[in-house]
Amino acid sequence: HDHEGAPAMPLPKRPEFYDFDLFKREPDRKGRDVPLKELRCVVFDTETTGLQPSAGDEIISIGAVRVTNGKIVRGETFERLINPGMKIPKPSIRFHGITDKDVKGKPDAATVLPQFRRFCGTAALVAHNAAFDMKFLELKEKVSGVNFTNPVLDILLLSAFLHDHADDHSLAATAERLGIEISGRHSALGDAMTEARIFLAMLGPLADRGVVTLGDALDVSRKQVKLRKMQARF
């Protein structure tokens, strides 16, 4: 929530997460062959109490939009605040502006995630730095009783494939390269909307590079994970 008089300290970026297994979720042959411009997908974002899902951080907000046949489906959005059952750490409030008061009396993840699961149905899931968001969903499988086995595309990895000359694949940098204006930054729904516009703006350049179907996109994503894991070792 940037407002005048706010300190001009840039927010630190979320660390990049890579999860090889995420891109092993192979849709069937028919699913692989679906052209990206006809793909039914749900583009989503989470806000969280911190950056360490395995160390007890929790989801406090989910926002999602539906994309069908290369268009954002207006009026088909999902937006929920979630009570994390813990105090929201001050440093994370700088990111998302969500306070303990905002989540007081809101449902917990065990209630919200089944609703989100129904919203997603069998659509492909699209997110920026998707392994981060997916890790939170995965760690809640036991309490929520739902798991997300949908194919997943990561905007960060697709950006790394398209703009391999660039170092910065943050949401802001990717949007700027594609000429997309960002609004509603750091609200889950605002970010999901931006991510949907970025994803759609990528379809032309991806097709120019031979990435036309869901299967093609999953293949280049896997290659990017491999590449980035190798680079991280040096």
Predicted regions and their residues:
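Conserved catalytic/binding loops enriched for acidic/polar residues
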Residues: 191
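Acidic two-metal-ion nuclease catalytic site recognized across multiple nuclease folds
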Residues: 2-33, 196, 200-234
